[in-house]
Amino acid sequence: MSAPRRIKIPTCALVGVIASVDELRLAPGMRAPPDLFELRLDHLPNLRESQLLKLRQPLIITARHPAEGGKKVRSARRDLLLKFLPRAKFVDVELRSLRELGPVWDEARRLHVGRICSFHDFKRTPEPAVLHKKLLRARKAGADVFKVVTRAEDFHDLLTLFELLWSELASMRLCVMASGKFGPISRLFFRDAGSSLIYAPLRHPLHHGQLTFQELRGQRDF
């Protein structure tokens, strides 16, 4: 596969996650919005294109696989993503879903939509060699960003994620965060360590260890 394109991202972009109707209503009126909004289409299966017109910030669209924290939906994930792809700045597709969502991945490239390839493990943090292999697969697939979220319950887990971020920054853009006990500190620490994106739900955390948008904005100079 060809080398990934360099999609322009701020040094560390703050992503506000919209995964509920009330968050969708909140977003347009925010005085200090995040750099991007992530639309969790698996939580918003009835979303209409007209509702996006009020969102001023660039959009990441995601229809998360149930095995990686997504919500089961009646509509095919592929159809949801293709519907909103023309309005997106980025699309997020799990590494495990590259074959299933191949048409989405290819269409994103055709439309010059940035491609985030992601991996989530909310039970543990895999060994460094496992994470490195997944990064290589994402890079081979042409991802603009490789996103990793794993459960970190001790300092060793946090260090594993930091080492991945620090050692691989030269090879491609990375978004690295933790869930669990060390989730909150990872969102502060990894921002300064080089993570391209840091996510925060506008109101409702989806996983243990997430900081809401207001909690994150209240820390330092986010």
Language-model-detected regions and their locations in the chain:
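Short, solvent-exposed coil/turn linker segments
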Residues: 20-22, 94, 212
